[in-house]
């Protein structure tokens, strides 16, 4: 049941991502593989069994050094230039799960898909923590704007 719920939420998040004409990406930093971006329009809170989680969509745009290595791993990845990943963080951001990875080509067509697992792992890198912090800040900003729009003048 938990897997089905998470799968449905991932699909929902991906639908929102596909529907957006222009993504609202913010660069978080660089890795040895490329540049990591957060999609500020695809952040969703989730409550399951009384626990709060945060779904976040991020993109890794591969650099020129990593692309040939990536593309040689599998025939399906020959044209891949970036990967869109959906993460699920626990309430305090100390644990995360990688739920889905979608490898896309230069035309944003999915060329390869990898399902993750809802198993939570400890956050171990600065960029993983920064991804959670930026997502939380964006969620707070969205709430603040929604509250402002609700006010009657």
Predicted regions: what they are:
Residues 20-84, 89-153:
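N-terminal secretory-pathway/extracellular module detecting exported/lumenal segments
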Residues 1-7:
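Bacterial N-terminal signal peptides that target proteins for export
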Residues 10-12:
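Short, linear, compositionally biased motifs with a strong N-terminal bias
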Residues 15-18:
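N-terminal signal peptide c-region/cleavage motif recognized by signal peptidases
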């Amino acid at each position: 049941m938990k897997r089905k719920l998470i799968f449905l939420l991932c699909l929902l998040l991906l639908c929102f991502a596909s529907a957006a004409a222009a993504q609202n990406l913010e660069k978080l930093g660089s890795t040895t593989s490329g540049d990591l971006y957060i999609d500020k329009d695809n952040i969703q809170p989730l409550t399951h069994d009384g626990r709060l989680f945060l779904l976040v969509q991020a993109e890794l745009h591969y650099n020129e050094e990593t692309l040939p290595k990536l593309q040689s791993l599998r025939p399906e990845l020959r044209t891949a230039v970036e990967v869109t990943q959906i993460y699920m963080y626990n309430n305090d951001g100390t644990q995360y799960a990688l739920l889905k990875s979608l490898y896309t080509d230069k035309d944003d067509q999915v060329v390869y898909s990898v399902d993750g697992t809802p198993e939570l792992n400890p956050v171990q890198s600065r960029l993983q923590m920064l991804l959670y912090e930026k997502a939380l800040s964006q969620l707070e900003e969205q709430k603040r704007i929604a509250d402002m729009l609700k006010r009657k003048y």
